[in-house]
Amino acid sequence: MGKKRIVFFAYLPFFTIFMSFSFAGITKESPFSIGQTLSSSNGVYELGFFSLNNSQNQYLGIWFKSIIPQVVVWVANREKPVTDSAANLGISSNGSLLLSNGKHGVVWSTGDIFASNGSRAELTDHGNLVFIDKVSGRTLWQSFEHLGNTLLPTSIMMYNLVAGEKRGLTAWKSYTDPSPGEFVALITPQVPSQGIIMRGSTRYYRTGPWAKTRFTGSPQMDESYTSPFILTQDVNGSGYFSFVERGKPSRMILTSEGTMKVLVHNGMDWESTYEGPANSCDIYGVCGPFGLCVVSIPPKCKCFKGFVPKFAKEWKKGNWTSGCVRRTELHCQGNSSGKDANVFYTVPNIKPPDFYEYANSQNAEECHQNCLHNCSCLAFSYIPGIGCLMWSKDLMDTRQFSAAGELLSIRLARSELDVNKRKMTIVASTVSLTLFVIFGFAAFGFWRCRVEHNAHISNDAWRNFLQSQDVPGLEFFEMNAIQTATNNFSLSNKLGPGGFGSVYKARNGKLQDGREIAVKRLSSSSGQGKQEFMNEIVLISKLQHRNLVRVLGCCVEGTEKLLIYGFLKNKSLDTFVFDARKKLELDWPKRFEIIEGIARGLLYLHRDSRLRVIHRDLKVSNILLDEKMNPKISDFGLARMFQGTQYQEKTRRVVGTLGYMSPEYAWTGVFSEKSDIYSFGVLLLEIISGKKISSFSYGEEGKALLAYAWECWCETREVNFLDQALADSSHPSEVGRCVQIGLLCVQHEPADRPNTLELLSMLTTTSDLPLPKKPTFVVHTRKDESPSNDSMITVNEMTESVIQGR
């Protein structure tokens, strides 16, 4: 297979060092050495020796031949690298493939196979290294039966209960160490099967049961999702899982952080079509037994109806792993219909809990009846593509999606529903009495409302509009009250500029009712219209997280549009980081806490909120600080919501702040989660250095901030990049790690940047980091230039560019 072997004896030493041979196959007479490669006949895959992180250690592996950077999909000697340049792969006297480390012995082999003379090893068009017996033609050994961290199309994960065999993926220890890590991916022998990721001996993530074409625990696998997966089970106790290639190079990988990804190459980058776990609710058992994880509504863990926290104090602290217990014990008597009879309460949009049992039922009603008459059945679900599932154990690892998901019916004591009926009766009586009193004042109120109608018509119109947008609890403030509180927007009450306007504080920071507020007054010349104003109100009202700013309400009178926030005494992060005196208040531990807090807020926006929001204007001045210096992401006027499986969008109107905008967004209008990651990388480097991206200049060449960060990292001089005010409070290795994370975030290609879950993992663990590529998109303003000189860029003929200077 492949090209003929090149034999050119006079120059053999030169080519062994400086270029690779194309190799046809491995036989006993022609062993395979460092510097040689073996290609599949279709030219897609290649076998050879490679090193990681410029190390002297060599590994024998398979990779995509024409894709740069190199993507390794299988490693033979992942636990024991070779270090001798004389290392080779050959066929031993007993007929097995073995990898020897020169004079240092054997480091890897296929084991005793006893192949006949003339047998050979080849690389198939599917990326499978096979060892074929010449006489029988049988495949004696193949790499597809010894998986690493990657599943290729036509390779298989499987289990066989009779033979006691199971085959799954094992993550690398780190990006630069292919030895087995702590995560393993398997398919379970349950009926129906499901995929699980194990972290050591404990479950870390599961896909939910398989329903013919999809995993029920993945909301992105809705009816519109074209599943690449195939999972089959037979009556002999075996199961097989694989995925199909749809015309483009693809792979499924278990990362060293424990994330399963399906990646497809589009000719330029690897695009992710599936990821799990995708957010914090996907982590196994996060809410404990009978706990329900609802990622979009904090706190994310709740108890099912009829259940209460097992340990209330711990639950309030956010320690949910102990789960919930029944408020009313069951008194099951099979088919009882009396006052002690059990009932079922149905919850929609559910990821089916773990430890399910398949029950043979023809339809949902039969499934219901079978569970009702079985006292050990605690819940049931009838799922298209599966049928009837029942649960007799604790409901574990259950979450609720904002859309998609299954119906789960939970057995409760009838009294649990009767309590609600009594409450409804009391509420109805109270409402009736209240309405009677209200109508008694209606005549007087009608006259007064007519008098004030004109003054409030604008607010009422906006109130109606906002109510139609499902924005609950939003307060509408009177213009007179705001003008009085801010001394008619006097300069003495001005806190500073904000996105699309100025921000003011109330006198003494308070309204007459004692509340501390800040008022964002939108400028009529700012370019922010109804859409951006609505964006900010709707998004901030629906998003609730400790690292996001909280909006109290709004006020609209004529041309005036005001947003009312809770007042944060420490203003924005830039007033500390870039101020020679105030920066001393933020030592390195505090800055790192701020960095981590921003990342957690970003994770909520991208993965944990039901809206899935891309901020598009993440920068230091848009990070507010409360009295304890906790960061709050603000200014959502430019934010966009993503739906379903959408991962990117393209706009004709590129808006944002120069220097923080990713290359693909600035020049083509394409934005995604990775655009915010780029902005975070710039923000991170600014926090570390105490320097502005828009005005920093270093050396005679006038290097910009990203270029200087790259230079310091390459020369392991990260301490030079650090703000000197942090010299005594920082640790060099921690600073170096953060600089490297920042550089990973600002890589030119979106596919090279970490996603938000990976970013937070990098910040909160000490696992090895991948090596960043040199940033190629560098915006720089010389000190003798006004920032506005660089504030306008042309994206394309169809794009209106509105770039806001900091």
UniProtKB/Swiss-Prot annotation:
Localization per Swiss-Prot or TrEMBL: Cell membrane
Sequence positions bearing Phosphoserine: S526, S541, S621, S634, S694, S695, S788
Family matches, as Pfam families: B_lectin (PF01453), DUF3403 (PF11883), PAN_2 (PF08276), PK_Tyr_Ser-Thr (PF07714), S_locus_glycop (PF00954)
Phosphothreonine: residues bearing it: T651
Disulfide bonds: C281-C293, C287-C301, C367-C388, C371-C377
Domain EGF-like: from-to ranges: 277-313
Transcription is among the record's keywords: no
Topological domain spans for side Cytoplasmic: 447-806
UniProt xrefs under SUPFAM superfamilies: alpha-D-mannose-specific plant lectins, Protein kinase-like (PK-like)
GO cellular component: a single term: plasma membrane
Binding site for ATP: L495, G496, P497, G498, G499, F500, G501, S502, V503, K520
Primary location group: membrane
Molecular functions (GO terms): ATP binding; calmodulin binding; carbohydrate binding; protein serine kinase activity; protein serine/threonine kinase activity; ubiquitin protein ligase binding
The keyword Transmembrane helix is assigned to this record: yes
Record GO biological process: recognition of pollen
Keywords, in A-Z order: ATP-binding, Cell membrane, Disulfide bond, EGF-like domain, Glycoprotein, Kinase, Lectin, Membrane, Nucleotide-binding, Phosphoprotein, Receptor, Serine/threonine-protein kinase, Signal, Transferase, Transmembrane, Transmembrane helix
Ranges for domain PAN: 332-414
Residues bearing attached sugar chains per UniProt: N53, N94, N117, N236, N319, N335, N374
Family the entry assigns: Belongs to the protein kinase superfamily. Ser/Thr protein kinase family.
Record-linked PANTHER family: BNACNNG56910D PROTEIN, RECEPTOR-LIKE SERINE/THREONINE-PROTEIN KINASE SD1-8
The protein, known as: G-type lectin S-receptor-like serine/threonine-protein kinase At1g61430
